[in-house]
């Protein structure tokens, strides 16, 4: 497209730090399109480290209790496995289907009224996860976080959460230590309730591993 210079004018754009596009319906397209691009253009056999980083992203989402975006990512993998023939028929339906799926997940239903926010209740101070600053710490925290996801969640109450986190603080090494949390969105206009579900985690992790293995096999 042609461009023009307009002295004295500027264009404002929302900063990337204030976007949640990796957590909403767009997560499906991020995952599917990355794989399609890698399959078409990667010069490396089997995409080199790409399948590993893709699986790691799924694990990170699950450790962060972001079950909605993790499930959309797996749907993206399933559609990649269907082959290119699905792209055009699904072009006009996948976005609406992804949005509709948000109703099934508390971590996708944005609460904007303070009266709807659950109270913070702790029997003891919530564990404060810190960013791993070495490979050894990263591995140790990842193993601890993954192990916790297999344990029973304990008491579950809709009117309580263990902690409140901003979007910038909602990282896997903090969320993996919690059973529940209230997490604000990037722009600060609302919050989601994150709730750990060990059964869902086990099923989702197994499915993600199987899908990645099948993509590598093919």
Kindly give the residue locations of the regions a language model identified:
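Secondary-structure capping and boundary motifs in well-ordered enzyme cores
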Residues: 23-26, 51
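Active-site donor/metal-binding and catalytic loop motifs
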Residues: 7-23
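Terminal low-complexity segments of carbohydrate-biosynthetic enzymes
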Residues: 32-218
């Amino acid at each position: 497209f042609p461009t023009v210079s307009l002295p004295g004018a500027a264009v404002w754009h929302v900063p990337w730090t204030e976007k949640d596009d990796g957590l909403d319906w767009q997560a499906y397209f991020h995952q599917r399109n990355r794989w399609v691009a890698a399959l078409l253009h990667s010069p490396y056999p089997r995409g080199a480290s790409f399948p590993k980083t893709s699986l790691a992203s799924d694990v990170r989402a699950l450790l962060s209790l972001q079950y909605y975006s993790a499930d959309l990512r797996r749907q993206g993998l399933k559609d990649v496995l269907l082959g290119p023939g699905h792209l055009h028929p699904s072009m006009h339906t996948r976005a609406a289907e992804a949005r509709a799926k948000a109703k099934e997940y508390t971590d996708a239903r944005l609460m904007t009224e303070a009266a709807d926010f659950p109270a913070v209740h702790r029997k003891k101070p919530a564990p404060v996860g810190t960013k791993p600053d070495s490979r050894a710490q990263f591995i140790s925290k990842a193993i601890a976080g993954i192990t916790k996801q297999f344990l029973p969640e304990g008491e579950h109450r809709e009117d309580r959460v263990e902690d409140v986190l901003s979007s910038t603080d909602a990282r896997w090494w903090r969320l993996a230590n919690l059973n529940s949390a209230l997490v604000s969105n990037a722009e600060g206009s609302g919050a989601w309730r994150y709730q750990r579900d060990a059964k869902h985690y086990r099923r989702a992790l197994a499915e993600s591993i199987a899908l990645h293995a099948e993509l590598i096999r093919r």
